[in-house]
């Protein structure tokens, strides 16, 4: 429908769906866009000008954000393709499958290899920018409650994985 072309400042936030699906979905949408734009769609007929000037992936990188609730390392492996600045971490609290009460362990497991800048972005700075949060006002709370990079950069030892958890955050297989 071209809504992002007509409204380039519109922001669309998809939550509770993770982000692992994004690269393949955008690749398929771009392929369909290219086929429709070139007329190579077999027996289907599309009106002239039905496609947007740019492929769907262009608008996704410009307008879309992904709420990665209870993200695991496999969930974030393609973060550079998606755009780290487009990913918003969420604990999924108070849902049964959320990270609580093992949130700090989940954060260490998921983000220890992401690097400090990417981790800070996904854990809060992206949301702060998107929603125009006052970071100075939030700093005392963050300093008191938030985990440090020194804490998050330490991988979990095998004996630290929670035994009775319902979150996907500790998933290690693709």
Where do the model's predicted regions map?
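Mid-to-C-terminal alpha-helical segments outside catalytic/metal-binding sites
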Residues: 2, 10, 20-21, 45-46, ...
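Aromatic-lined glycan-binding groove of carbohydrate-active enzymes
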Residues: 2-57, 61
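Short leucine-rich amphipathic alpha-helices used at interfaces
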Residues: 58, 89-90
């Amino acid at each position: 429908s071209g809504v992002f072309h007509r409204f380039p400042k519109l922001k669309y936030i998809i939550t509770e769906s993770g982000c692992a699906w994004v690269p393949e979905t955008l690749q398929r949408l771009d392929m369909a866009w290219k086929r429709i734009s070139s007329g190579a769609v077999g027996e289907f007929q599309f009106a002239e000008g039905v496609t947007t000037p740019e492929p769907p992936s262009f608008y996704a990188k410009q307008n879309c954000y992904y709420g990665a609730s209870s993200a695991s390392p496999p969930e974030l492996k393609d973060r550079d393709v998606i755009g780290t600045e487009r990913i918003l971490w969420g604990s999924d609290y108070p849902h049964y499958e959320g990270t609580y009460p093992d949130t700090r362990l989940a954060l260490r497991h998921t983000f220890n290899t992401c690097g400090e800048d990417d981790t800070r972005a996904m854990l809060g700075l992206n949301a702060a920018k998107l929603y125009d949060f006052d970071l100075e006002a939030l700093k005392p709370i963050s300093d008191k409650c938030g985990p440090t990079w020194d804490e998050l950069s330490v991988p979990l030892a095998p004996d630290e994985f929670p035994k009775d958890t319902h979150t996907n955050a500790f998933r290690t297989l693709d």
